[in-house]
Amino acid sequence: MRKILVIWLIFIMNIYSEIPSGKLPSVFWLGLSDSEKVSFVNGAYGAISLLKNSHKNEVRKQYLHNKNWIQPYYIERFYDIADEYLSEEAGYNLKIIVLHMDALYANSDNHKIPVLEAMRVVSLMQDGLRDKANLRLLQLQRKY
């Protein structure tokens, strides 16, 4: 579990370390080749899925013996947020996510939005949750 957490933290730090150096997330994203973008999205999907499954297994191990235990809301919410980053409609065709992220970063209002947050908005849109995706996009535009 610690290995996964360390890998996840290194992954996040690498993504967000681009911002202090003056490099915008959109410049980072648009500077990648198409195959690098697909690999990036594939890696992010894999890391999020692994993190979620590992957490489920650890919770199961910890509370397996307690029959009165009920899963708290914050754990369900954590899983829901993790699912927002993964598009089920796109399936294994990650090129769709890449093309939509390119389109998202084409708008100058979105240049400062972090790459993972952009992936979250695109995944929500792909899954048909347009209202939620638009609300999240407006929040991110206001924040960044």
Label for each model-derived stretch:
Residues 18-54:
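Immediate post-signal-peptide N-terminus of mature secreted/exported proteins
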